[in-house]
């Protein structure tokens, strides 16, 4: 890496990217185990019960790293096309 350029850290974009990466991994893990990923994620988001999420591929450990309200915030922003 060259010392000529300063890289800016954007915590908002970083959170958005991290949330998307984690949800994608969790979704794929649920799908691989034969679950309906959308139903399982909705169950988790509504109840807060992490047992809706499989332990397969560490999916449960990943999803609990995120606050449920922050997940919902990112999902709503994405749905409405708001950055």
UniProtKB/Swiss-Prot annotation:
Which domain of life does the protein's organism represent? Bacteria
Pfam family, any one = IreB
The record's section on HAMAP family has: UPF0297
Q: Which family does it belong to?
A: Belongs to the UPF0297 family.
Query: What's the protein here called?
Result: UPF0297 protein CBO2563/CLC_2434
Q: Which organism is it from?
A: Clostridium botulinum (strain Hall / ATCC 3502 / NCTC 13319 / Type A)
């Amino acid at each position: 890496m060259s010392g000529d350029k300063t890289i800016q850290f954007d915590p908002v974009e970083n959170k958005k990217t991290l949330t998307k990466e984690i949800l994608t991994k969790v979704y794929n893990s649920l799908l691989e185990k034969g679950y309906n990923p959308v139903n399982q994620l909705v169950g988790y988001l509504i109840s807060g019960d992490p047992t809706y999420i499989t332990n397969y591929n560490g999916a449960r450990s990943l999803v609990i790293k995120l606050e449920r309200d922050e997940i919902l915030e990112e999902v709503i922003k994405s749905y409405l096309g708001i950055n």
